Amino acid sequence: MTAFLWAQDRDGLIGKDGHLPWHLPDDLHYFRAQTVGKIMVVGRRTYESFPKRPLPERTNVVLTHQEDYQAQGAVVVHDVAAVFAYAKQHPDQELVIAGGAQIFTAFKDDVDTLLVTRLAGSFEGDTKMIPLNWDDFTKVSSRTVEDTNPALTHTYEVWQKKA
């Protein structure tokens, strides 16, 4: 399985200055639940946005073009083929692609599961989720969580690629 995991506002926004444009603890718990025990692939900038690195209890894989980049406690790779080679060596762990936008683009043709959190509000930011062909996927679950701040009301959706 290769899954995309991300949160977006109602306009598809996913980032602001290298960080999330909102603070949503419930979604951070969801992110953790979806990545613990798995291979989590992120780009260098996304990795560096984490307050504590590497994220515990999961394999942190950093995909970067910087040949000399080092990330203590993480696996650093320089192309998509290296990610799949690493995953093949660890068949017991699912592959979760967690951004940013360039990393999603690199894996766009390989994804079979979409784990998206949709926030009801509209936020300020500078990075949107890449376009996906939603017709290639079927929604298999959806759960809405109300928030006292209507903009933070959010829905967790799981989509599977059609056979």
Swiss-Prot record:
Q: Which UniProt keywords apply?
A: Antibiotic resistance, Methotrexate resistance, NADP, One-carbon metabolism, Oxidoreductase
Binding-site residues, substrate: L5, W6, A7, D27, R32, R58, T117
- Where the record annotates domain DHFR, the positions are 2-161
InterPro entries (alphabetical): DHFR (IPR012259), DHFR-like_dom_sf (IPR024072), DHFR_CS (IPR017925), DHFR_dom (IPR001796)
Enzymatic class: oxidoreductase
Pathway connected to this protein: Cofactor biosynthesis; tetrahydrofolate biosynthesis; 5,6,7,8-tetrahydrofolate from 7,8-dihydrofolate: step 1/1
- Residues engaged in binding methotrexate: D27, R32, R58
Reaction catalysed by this enzyme: (6S)-5,6,7,8-tetrahydrofolate + NADP(+) = 7,8-dihydrofolate + NADPH + H(+)
What does it do? Key enzyme in folate metabolism. Catalyzes an essential reaction for de novo glycine and purine synthesis, and for DNA precursor synthesis.
Q: What else is known?
A: This bacterial strain is resistant to the folic acid analog methotrexate (amethopterin).
Q: What is this protein called?
A: Dihydrofolate reductase
Tell me what organism the protein belongs to.
Answer: Lacticaseibacillus casei
Whichever gene encodes this chain, its name is folA
